[in-house]
Structures are given as structure tokens and as C-alpha cells.
């Protein structure tokens, strides 16, 4: 566990050398690789290799986090809320003491971060103490033909042939402590280094994952599952599908746009396809029916226990009532968030301007302005304008007109209902469509009224509408929060003899299992590993498809079969393998260890047949997809010619 890190707060990683090398997924490092890429130096397409420490590339927004200890603080947190009369009062009291406990950690030691997380729907609370390192540099990235082989087509699919890995290095000050980026920093020397195994695995071999899974909803009620399906999941499917089609068309046409939009397209499409698979799996695996059966058993238990009946008699009627009360508006809010908050980047810029603190210290203002201006590096105004028009149309067709924000009235009255004309005018008259205009806004002595800018003005209208919609369901949401907490607690008490693991919440978790294939449907069986043979098969099958395009020199290297010590027992090269470990988003980059604590590979995906895994674990069907560490080392040494990195590893 001392070698396992949270990578950027959104992925996982593992330390593999005495000089702070970290293995994580290619898609976890994708944004960093993209930021350093240009048409002239296309590290996304061609890969990147640092031949020396001096060539390693800094990433100002990136950090790694080491867990030092955990502590149960449930009594202290709940004691602060014992006099709360409403759910909102309870939340305020709980949040307040959680923040205080976290701050106490950093006050005692400024190099530490304390975070209190809720477990079991807010029935328990635990403090995690971390040490963060903010100087993390890119060392090695394979070309996307390795790290993203299969792209969207193969995403969430098995069999898989993706070398989804990248290599970074942690830097520290001369005392080996955390420090912001400085050319004077030196490679970090970790407390523990994960050894690497070249022995591989067999069917049934022990395998465990260690990482930082983001979130699951394993104990959510059936009412909550229905809301998830028909609300946020369906909104994501509909809206992102429209937005991504526009992005993809232009990315395929222009290399500069492909680089600019690569990271945001990758992030967007990942959860878009996840939502599609989740909704299908919920139906196919009868998740709702199973959850309702569990709820029926709980109803019987409540009826059979008078002391429980007194407390929980209205539990299910309250959940049903309040989920019903917010159903329509919650669905509209889901579309609102996808179409506007996560839609056109002009709106996102305007929202950040509205939140800009002009009274902050000069250093903070300059830093914030720099970050805002950097957003234009990955923005194409013509594409964003097309996206905005598409988002306006999509939202209008998906929700009742009473949920339309004020700008639709303007479109009707001033533009005769012509959305495209409105958008053309908006982008032509707003000053924040360019860095130059934004600079003018953010100068301290500006006399320009920000609200007079049409993009900022409409964003203010959006905030007002969003707040209004949220407020109208606040009471129902409070009752649901309380109901889900009581439901979670009741299920655990009904099965008091069982151990219930808590839902994922971005804290470190271990999952143990075995390497094993599975049967996706009747009459079919999938093996537990893939080899480079499948790369050639997919390249041939998908000839002309950019998702499966591979450089001739890589194909030549693979066809030479010069696998050396990285070959399996048959002399072939394993690429990926699967296990029945339990993972979710955030586990990407998680170390996959054998029983001796040696690294077998990195987890990077789940399988399509069990996409409802955030709601229910299906042991016979659910699989963790990992990239074999031997393939990683082969690519580093043979393709990247980076033998210097191989020498840093503890290979067994």
C-alpha cells in the first residue's frame, strides 16, 4: 500500500523505482501528454521518451497522493449533529466538523492533508491523512496506437489489446519532502517500491488490486436506480452523443483539432459509453428486480420487529413519494447540466468569470487569469459555436418548456425562434470568445461591466434558472438523502452477521480475486488473456479505421517476435488479461499484484457485459481488464529504446 498512489485525484498509480517512477494508465496521463503535444511534436500520436532527467516534462496541475493513516471519527462527527432538527441542519453540522477535523491535520503539519469522508450513506465517517507531491513529470508515453489501441470501438470491451500505460516521475525537494515544481527539485525516494514480476499468471492465479475507486452506488434503493437510469444516464447518452459527433467530425478532418480536443473528447466519450452500457446491463441483468426483492425482504423484517417498525414504517413510502416529487425536475436538471454546464465552452468560461475574485491577492489573480487564458489553447470558436446551437436544440426537445431558461424568450422575440441566428450574434458580440477580450475583462482597472457581455449575461440567467430548479426540489432531496441513509443502515442491521464493504468514495481500497475468463452469453467463452496476435487480427479486420491504425515500425517489431524475457511460456507476448477483481472509475492505473506483492499489470477497464457494476457486483460476469506489465516493459525497452528506465525497476 505504501507504493500505491492516488494519481491526480482521478486515477491510481504505483511507485516502481527508488527514484520515484510511477506507472499509471495512458488514459490517466492523456491530458498531460496532450498538453505537451503540438502538430510538430505530436506525443499523442508518436509517443514520448525522456532520455534523461532533464528531458522529463513538468505538469503543473498534476499531483500524487500517498495515504499515511486512517482514523474512525464517526462519534465526533455525529455528536456535532445530534441536535439537528432537519436534514439540512444535519448536513451543515456534519460538513462543518468534517472540515475542522481535516484542517487540524494540516495545522499540525503543513505537508499533510486531512480529508474526512462519509461511508455507508453518511452513517460512518473516517479521516484519511495524506502527503501530496505536486511536482510530477512525464517520463514515457507509448504512441496512441499502443496506449489507445481500439479507442472508442474497444472501450469497455473484452477481448482487448490496449497497452494502456504511461510513466511519470515524482520530484521532491532536497529533503525528500513535497515541493511545487522547481528545476532544483530531485527525484523522490519512496518508502517502498513495488517489485515487478515476469512470471505472469495462469487461470485461477491469485490477483489483488490496490487503488482509489471513485464512487459506487451498491446500496442505492430501487427508486434511486430508476432515477439514475432515466435521469443523468439518459441525459449523458443523448446530449454527449450530439456534442461528440461534432467534435469527432472535426478531429478526423484536422490534426490541430485532434490534438486540441483529444483529452476532452476522451473523457466525455468514456462516460457516455459507460452510461449506455450501464442502462443496458441494468435491464439485461434484472438489477431493479433483484433490488426490489431485497427491499421486500427488508419490509418483512421491519414488520416483524416492533422497534424497527416504529422508526422505519414510513421509509419506503417516503422514498417513493420524494423520488416521485422530484422526478421530472431532476431529469430536466440532468439535461441542463449536460447541455449547458458541460456543453459549450463559452458558457464554462463565462461561469468562471462570474466566480472570479477581483479582490484577491495579486498573485492569486495572476495565477487564476493564467489558467483561464490557457483554456483558449484547446478551444476552437467555430466548433464551440456549432456545439452551442446543437445544445440549445437538444435541450429544447428533451424538456418541458417551463424548464427553458430566459435566453429562449430572447431567441423567440428577437430572433424569431432562430437558434442559429442567436448563436451567431452571441459569438460575434461577446468579448470573451478570445484571450484578448478576456484579458480586457480581468484587468483590475477595467471600467467595462461584465454583465453587459452577452455570454456572461446568459450564463447568469443559466445560474438563476439552475438555482430555481434546484430549490424547487430541495425538500424532496433532503428527504431522499435521509431515506437512503436509513435504508442503508437498516439493511446492515437486518444482516448484522454479514460484513458490508462501504461504497467507493475515492479512498484506498483493496480487492482480491483470481485471474479468470468468463462466459459473456450462452455458448461463448472468453479466455483470460490476449496476445499480440490479436493486434494483427484487429488491424486487418478494421483496415482504414483510425481506431486501429498502428505504425508500420511497431507492427514490424511485433512480427519479429523478439520478445526476450518478456515472452510467456509459449514464447508469445501477452498484452492484456482479466481477473474477477472489483474495480470502478478511479481504479484506472491500480496495481494488479500477485500473492507475493509483485506487479502483474495495471487495471484500466471493465467489461461491457457487467456495466451495471457501480450498482451491483456480478462475480460470474464482472471482470477487471489489465495491461500485462511484460507488454509494458517490452514497449518501453524495445520500442521506446528506454533501457535506462528498465534498469530502475526491481524485476523478479
Regions found by a protein language model. Give the residues of each.
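Terminal presequence/propeptide segments associated with secretion/organelle targeting
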Residues: 1-652
Amino acid at each position: 500500500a505504501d507504493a500505491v498512489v492516488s494519481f491526480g485525484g482521478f486515477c491510481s498509480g504505483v511507485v516502481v523505482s527508488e527514484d520515484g517512477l510511477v506507472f499509471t494508465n495512458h488514459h490517466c496521463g492523456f491530458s498531460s501528454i496532450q498538453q505537451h503535444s503540438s502538430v510538430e511534436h505530436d506525443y499523442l500520436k508518436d509517443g514520448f521518451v525522456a532520455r534523461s532527467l532533464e528531458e522529463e516534462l513538468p505538469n503543473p496541475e498534476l499531483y500524487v497522493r500517498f495515504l499515511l493513516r486512517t482514523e474512525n471519527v464517526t462519534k465526533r462527527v455525529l455528536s456535532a449533529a445530534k441536535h439537528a432538527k432537519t436534514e439540512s441542519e444535519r448536513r451543515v453540522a456534519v460538513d462543518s466538523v468534517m472540515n475542522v477535523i481535516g484542517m487540524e491535520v494540516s495545522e499540525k503539519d503543513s505537508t499533510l492533508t486531512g480529508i474526512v469522508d462519509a461511508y455507508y450513506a453518511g452513517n460512518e465517517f473516517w479521516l484519511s491523512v495524506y502527503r501530496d507531491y505536486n511536482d510530477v513529470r512525464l517520463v514515457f508515453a507509448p504512441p496512441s496506437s499502443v496506449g489507445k489501441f481500439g479507442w472508442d470501438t474497444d472501450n469497455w470491451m473484452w477481448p482487448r489489446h490496449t497497452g494502456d500505460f504511461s510513466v511519470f516521475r515524482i520530484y521532491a525537494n532536497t529533503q525528500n519532502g513535497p515541493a511545487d515544481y522547481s528545476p532544483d527539485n530531485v527525484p523522490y525516494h519512496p518508502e517502498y517500491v513495488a517489485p515487478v514480476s515476469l512470471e505472469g499468471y495462469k487461470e485461477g492465479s491469485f490477483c489483488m488490486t490496490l487503488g482509489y475507486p471513485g464512487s459506487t452506488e451498491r446500496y442505492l434503493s430501487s427508486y434511486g436506480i430508476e432515477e439514475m437510469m432515466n435521469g443523468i444516464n439518459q441525459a449523458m447518452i443523448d446530449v454527449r452523443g450530439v456534442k461528440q459527433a461534432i467534435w469527432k467530425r472535426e478531429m478526423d478532418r484536422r490534426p490541430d483539432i485532434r490534438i486540441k480536443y483529444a483529452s476532452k473528447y476522451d473523457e466525455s466519450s468514456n462516460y457516455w459509453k459507460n452510461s449506455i452500457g450501464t442502462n443496458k446491463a441494468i435491464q439485461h441483468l434484472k438489477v431493479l428486480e433483484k433490488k426490489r426483492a431485497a427491499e421486500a425482504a427488508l419490509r418483512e423484517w421491519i414488520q416483524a420487529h416492533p422497534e424497527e417498525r416504529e422508526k422505519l414504517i414510513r421509509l419506503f413510502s417516503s422514498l417513493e413519494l420524494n423520488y416521485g416529487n422530484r422526478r421530472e425536475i431532476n431529469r430536466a436538471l440532468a439535461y441542463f447540466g449536460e447541455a449547458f454546464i458541460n456543453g459549450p465552452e463559452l458558457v464554462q468560461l463565462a461561469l468562471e468569470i462570474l466566480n472570479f475574485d477581483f479582490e484577491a491577492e495579486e498573485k492569486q489573480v495572476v495565477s487564476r487569469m493564467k489558467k483561464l487564458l490557457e483554456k483558449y489553447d484547446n478551444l476552437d470558436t467555430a466548433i464551440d459555436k456549432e456545439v452551442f446551437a446543437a445544445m440549445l436544440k437538444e435541450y429544447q426537445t428533451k424538456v418541458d418548456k417551463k424548464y427553458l431558461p430566459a435566453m429562449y424568450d430572447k431567441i423567440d422575440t428577437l430572433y424569431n425562434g432562430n437558434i442559429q441566428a442567436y448563436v451567431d450574434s452571441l459569438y460575434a458580440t461577446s468579448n470573451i470568445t478570445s484571450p484578448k477580450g478576456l484579458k480586457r475583462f480581468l484587468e483590475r482597472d477595467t471600467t467595462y461591466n461584465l454583465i453587459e457581455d452577452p455570454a456572461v449575461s446568459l450564463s447568469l440567467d443559466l445560474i438563476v434558472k439552475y438555482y430555481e430548479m434546484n430549490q424547487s426540489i430541495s425538500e424532496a432531496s433532503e428527504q431522499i438523502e435521509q431515506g437512503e441513509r436509513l435504508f442503508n443502515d437498516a439493511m446492515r442491521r437486518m444482516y448484522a452477521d454479514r460484513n458490508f464493504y462501504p461504497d467507493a468514495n475515492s479512498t484506498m481500497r483493496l480487492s482480491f480475486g483470481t485471474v479468470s475468463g468468463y462466459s459473456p452469453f450462452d455458448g461463448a467463452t472468453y479466455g483470460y488473456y490476449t496476445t499480440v496476435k490479436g493486434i494483427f487480427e484487429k488491424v486487418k479486420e478494421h483496415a482504414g479505421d483510425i481506431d486501429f491504425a498502428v505504425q508500420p515500425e511497431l507492427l514490424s517489431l511485433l512480427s519479429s517476435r523478439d520478445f526476450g524475457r518478456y515472452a510467456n511460456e509459449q514464447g508469445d507476448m501477452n498484452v492484456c488479461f482479466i481477473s474477477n477483481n472489483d474495480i470502478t472509475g478511479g481504479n484506472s492505473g491500480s496495481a494488479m499484484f500477485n500473492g507475493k506483492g509483485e506487479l502483474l499489470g495495471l487495471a484500466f477497464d471493465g467489461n461491457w457485459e457487467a456495466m451495471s457494476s457501480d450498482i451491483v457486483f456480478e462475480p460470474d460476469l464482472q471482470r477487471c481488464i489489465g495491461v500485462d506489465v511484460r507488454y509494458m516493459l517490452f514497449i518501453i525497452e524495445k520500442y521506446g529504446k528506454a533501457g535506462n528506465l528498465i534498469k530502475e525497476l526491481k524485476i523478479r
